[in-house]
């Protein structure tokens, strides 16, 4: 379910030069922008866990990039191609927490957060709940979101660095 767009009066004023300028943070992010951006990130992971790839893709800008392991996926087509290779029998949950938000300008924000992943794949469909003894992995995630012309905040770039792996 899509949330209504958060319209910014200066949404059309973004230029490629201003949105791609250096990584200097401009400061705090307005609460309504934090809410809209956090919903985009959480909506992505909720959809990813349920193999709802159309909703996952809708959270990315058309030219968005996603660093997934060693692969840098560029654009929605590459992202979809990678997602379609995921196991249809896995049960997975991504838990995003401890968000820190910074503004670059009125049209772009950065987020740093923790991501813990719980995973099981028996190779065949299973009944819930699935018994596991530990998380699959945990680490640091980051993303950059931009306010697009339609007033929605979408992910321009997302990356994840593994910090903890849990032996089987």
Features from the language model and the residues they span:
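Short, surface-exposed loop/helix-turn segments at secondary-structure junctions
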Residues: 123-131
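Short, low-complexity N-terminal intrinsically disordered segments enriched in polar/charged residues
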Residues: 1-54, 58-59
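Charge-dense, low-complexity intrinsically disordered segments
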Residues: 27, 31, 73, 132
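Soluble or luminal CAZymes and related metallo-dependent hydrolases
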Residues: 36, 93, 137
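A solvent-exposed, acidic/Ser-Thr-rich amphipathic alpha-helical stretch
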Residues: 53-121
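Short beta-strand edge/turn micro-motifs at domain boundaries
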Residues: 2-9, 108-110, 133-168
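Outer-membrane beta-barrel domain signature
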Residues: 88, 131-132
């Amino acid at each position: 379910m899509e949330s209504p767009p958060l319209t910014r009066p200066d949404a059309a004023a973004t230029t490629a030069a201003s949105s791609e300028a250096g990584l200097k943070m401009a400061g705090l992010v307005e609460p309504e922008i934090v809410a809209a951006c956090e919903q985009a990130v959480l909506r992505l992971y909720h959809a990813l866990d349920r193999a709802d790839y159309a909703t996952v893709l809708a959270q990315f800008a058309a030219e968005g990039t996603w660093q997934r392991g060693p692969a840098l996926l560029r654009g929605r087509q590459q992202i979809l191609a990678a997602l379609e290779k995921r196991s249809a029998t896995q049960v997975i949950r991504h838990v995003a927490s401890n968000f820190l938000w910074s503004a670059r300008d009125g049209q772009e924000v950065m987020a740093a957060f923790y991501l813990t992943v719980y995973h099981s794949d028996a190779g065949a469909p299973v009944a819930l709940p699935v018994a596991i003894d530990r998380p699959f992995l945990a680490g640091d995630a980051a993303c950059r979101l931009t306010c697009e012309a339609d007033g929605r905040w979408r992910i321009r770039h997302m990356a994840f660095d593994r910090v903890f792996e849990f032996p089987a």
